[in-house]
């Protein structure tokens, strides 16, 4: 079962840690009805950290292992081409990410060609789909790849924390821009990519040059 929880700014000032996805916490407060939609909500007055959460621990463990292997080192980062004309995208064919990338591209440079690999970006099979997308587009001689998806919970974004996805990005001959979730979301893919964009829209801004600057 799930229940929405709210903590107002006054109570948040008393926290001695920063809340993040995947943490296990103990919450004290009151349950009341949210008048706008008639749903019950937990109004948190106190939050204490209890453990670190299995997903968060798995994330930290893999991040530390790959960092020790040198996979995040700057010497492996490929430069993003300034004037890309063919851009590969690994993301879902339906969703905010591809819509945002297409809108930004059409505004900045409608002459740029976008090649989409429609990947699963959530669920148990997503990691295999993302890896296949990276490998497929890497063989097409494109200028740059954007790999990512729109926002979600840590569980929703977990495919981008899988080791096989990190290795596919690391081994990719085409420069890769990671674009997973929102600005506050950080994944293993972000560490290993040649460039991290905070959102899919930002990735398009970084990958697509504005042709109007030459007018």
Feature roles, as predicted:
Residues 1, 20-33, 44:
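OB-fold and OB-like beta-barrel modules that bind single-stranded nucleic acids
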Residues 40:
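Extended, highly charged clamp/arch subdomains and adjacent linkers
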Residues 88-215:
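Short glycine/threonine-rich loop/turn motifs
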Residues 16, 43-106, 110:
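Extended, charge-rich, solvent-exposed interface segments
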Residues 9, 44-46, 192:
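A short beta-strand motif that forms part of the nucleic acid-binding face
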């Amino acid at each position: 079962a799930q229940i929405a929880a709210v903590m107002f700014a006054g109570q948040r000032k008393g926290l001695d840690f920063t809340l993040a996805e995947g943490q296990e916490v103990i919450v004290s407060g009151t349950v009341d009805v949210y008048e706008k939609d008639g749903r019950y909500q937990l109004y948190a007055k106190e939050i204490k950290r209890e453990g670190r959460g299995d997903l968060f621990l798995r994330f930290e463990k893999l991040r530390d292992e790959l960092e020790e292997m040198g996979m995040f080192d700057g010497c492996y980062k490929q430069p993003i081409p300034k004037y890309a004309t063919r851009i590969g995208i690994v993301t879902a064919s339906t969703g905010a990410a591809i819509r945002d990338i297409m809108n930004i591209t059409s505004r900045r440079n409608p002459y740029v060609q976008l090649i989409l690999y429609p990947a699963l970006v959530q669920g148990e099979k997503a990691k295999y789909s993302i890896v296949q997308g990276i490998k497929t587009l890497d063989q097409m001689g494109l200028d740059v790849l954007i790999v990512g998806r729109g926002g979600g919970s840590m569980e929703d974004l977990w495919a981008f924390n899988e080791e096989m996805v990190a290795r596919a990005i690391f081994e990719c001959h085409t420069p890769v821009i990671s674009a997973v979730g929102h600005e506050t979301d950080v994944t293993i893919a972000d560490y290993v990519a040649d460039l991290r964009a905070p959102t899919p829209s930002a990735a398009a801004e970084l990958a697509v040059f504005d042709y109007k600057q030459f007018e």
